[in-house]
Amino acid sequence: MEKIVVALGKRSYPISIGEGLLTHAELFKSAIKGKRVMIVSNEIVAPLYLACCKETLIDFQIDEIILPDGEKFKNLHTFEIILTALLSNKHARDTTIIALGGGVIGDMAGFAAACYQRGVPFIQVPTTVLSQVDSSVGGKTAVNHPLGKNMIGAFYQPQSVIIDIDCLKTLPAREFSAGMAEVIKYGILYDQAFFIWLEENVTAIKTLQPAAITYMIKRCCEIKAEIVSLDEKEGGIRALLNLGHTFGHAIEAEQGYGNWLHGEAVASGMVLAAKTALNLGLIESAQIEQIILLIKQFDLPVNAPENMHYDQFFDHMQLDKKVLDGKLRLILPTSIGRCEIFDNVSETVLRSVIES
């Protein structure tokens, strides 16, 4: 088992990574303060892993909420269902919420934990690549609004993140590929050596070799933990983690949440960001080709949706949370392993990239 600590002073917490961790009772017990837990999961994950979790938590009083699966249910209505279940079962401030599922479950359960009685403890138990390498770490919690993704939320850190890599054995191929977009993102924005390692280990990753998967998840979590420790609430360097997301969120919102998976939209968004950087003379064309090839090797899209035009992109991008003083800020790669924030990209350049 590998361990990483997200260093945030009194709110620091461990990330545990390994095989069979859903059965490690001590990992859960050390993060649960009271006697009651509320497990939040969905109709896909619950039949696979809920019974195992309940067996591990046999010493606690357990309630559960099983939600419908999918990004389209990440909304205020579903959020209210979680709160109603907590209230109707008379949960108090010493209840611990356990998010058992992918990014949607983690985001909603975490936001419920942040809001319920002004904050109760929660544990992230991510079951997808995307949630294991990205969304479960760092304390971002949210629900979507019809006008924008993750517009209603809070920064709220978990007590612990427990990553059982065995959960990936039941993950559909499309979901696995979507998660790999966030993995590739770390290589592009922060760690050239990790990007090269990904290029060299495509087969080992796609065949779920435990050593490769464990290292991959650990390295992603190390990078995110380091960045979050420096900038918890995205006032500076943490914004770099949004590489590809300004374009990607526009794709998700315009296409309808769930029609393009988040990782698919981010993959396309990273290519658009890289092409924008190329247009501005910030990055070499050979490195763009490397980025596109690696994204393709994990069966991810490298083009924007054919039915999306510049005006549709721009309307959604204006709602991006990184907009400051009316200026759109873009995260652009200047080389593989390094990104910077730019707030002076002209509409002419953006139009050229999107319509090319």
Curated annotation (Swiss-Prot):
Q: What class of enzyme is it?
A: lyase
Q: Which residues bind NAD(+)?
A: 69-74, 103-107, 127-128, 140, 149, 167-170
Question: Required cofactors, per record?
Answer: Co(2+); Zn(2+); NAD(+)
List of residues binding Zn(2+): E182, H245, H262
Q: Which reaction does it catalyse?
A: 7-phospho-2-dehydro-3-deoxy-D-arabino-heptonate = 3-dehydroquinate + phosphate
List the CDD domains. Answer: DHQS
* Listed pathway(s): Metabolic intermediate biosynthesis; chorismate biosynthesis; chorismate from D-erythrose 4-phosphate and phosphoenolpyruvate: step 2/7
Supply the alphabetized keyword list: Amino-acid biosynthesis, Aromatic amino acid biosynthesis, Cobalt, Cytoplasm, Lyase, Metal-binding, NAD, Nucleotide-binding, Zinc
**UniProt-listed Enzyme Commission number(s):** 4.2.3.4
Q: GO cellular component terms? A: cytoplasm
Main localisation, per the record? Answer: cytoplasm
The lineage's top-level taxon is Bacteria
Q: Which SUPFAM superfamilies match?
A: Dehydroquinate synthase-like (SSF56796)
Q: Name one GO molecular function term.
A: nucleotide binding
Q: Extract one GO BP annotation from the record.
A: chorismate biosynthetic process
Pfam families associated with the record: DHQ_synthase (PF01761), DHQS_C (PF24621)
**Record-annotated disulphide pairs:** none
Q: How is the cofactor bound?
A: Binds 1 divalent metal cation per subunit. Can use either Co(2+) or Zn(2+).
What does it do?
Answer: Catalyzes the conversion of 3-deoxy-D-arabino-heptulosonate 7-phosphate (DAHP) to dehydroquinate (DHQ).
- HAMAP family the record matches: DHQ_synthase (MF_00110)
NCBIfam families noted in UniProt: aroB (TIGR01357)
Q: Which family does it belong to?
A: Belongs to the sugar phosphate cyclases superfamily. Dehydroquinate synthase family.
The identity of this protein, by name, is 3-dehydroquinate synthase
Q: Which organism is it from?
A: Psychromonas ingrahamii (strain DSM 17664 / CCUG 51855 / 37)
Gene responsible for this protein: aroB
